Swiss-Prot record:
Keywords: ATP-binding, Cytoplasm, Kinase, Nucleotide-binding, Pyrimidine biosynthesis, Transferase. Belongs to the UMP kinase family. Pathway: Pyrimidine metabolism; CTP biosynthesis via de novo pathway; UDP from UMP (UMPK route): step 1/1. It catalyses: UMP + ATP = UDP + ADP. It is found in: Cytoplasm. This is Uridylate kinase. It is an enzyme of class 2 (transferase). It holds the Pfam family AA_kinase. It comes from the Archaea. Its main location: cytoplasm. One of its GO terms (molecular function) is UMP kinase activity. The keyword ATP-binding applies. ATP binds at G9, S10, G44, R48, T137, N138, Y143, D146.
Amino acid sequence: MYSVVALGGSVVNVDKPERIKETAEILRNGLDSGLKICVVVGGGPTARRYINVARNLGTPETLLDEMGIAVTRLNAMLLGAALGLHDLHVPETPVEAARIVRRNGVAVCGGTHPGHTTDAVAAMIAELLEGPLVIVTNVDGVYDKDPSEPGARKLRELRPEELEELAVRAELKAGGSFVVDPLAAKMISRGQIVTHVVSWEDFRSRGLENVVRGRHNGTIIEG
């Protein structure tokens, strides 16, 4: 069974080496259970620091995208090292990532193209592999509005089209934020990708082999 795991930069963070070790162990256990895994790593706080400094220096937005992608690839190399993949080649496109997973059973990558978030890249790879997508984030699932707002309600299940609608609505709202960005939500909806949105704590306690089968406390997105 193929599975794609999107890890936010808050998970693979150079300031939290123990979390990187734990993440690698969870992924190794998933591989040992027979899963074939592609991991897509975000840039997180490190990318934001570089981008903020560069933006203040007047750097064009396209180059800022490239800087962010470079950081995600460094994070991918770091996680690959934690997995013992010392000859790791970081794929540069979703097609290449899918090809490596089919051949080797595992791949670790970061961003690929300017304007494409790592969650969107993960969704593209999941579509190619026809496997479930797991998004590990800093909230415990998808909410009907910003979780910090009073009355916000966690959604246990929803359809891909509903996810896309929520993501677009959050983007249009001033200061709004959503656990899945609009581009990734669009990719999930287009490909009708079974998606599990879980917190890091849930991911750690349940293990990947349980999460991909819906045994978690997060949100399941399925058509």
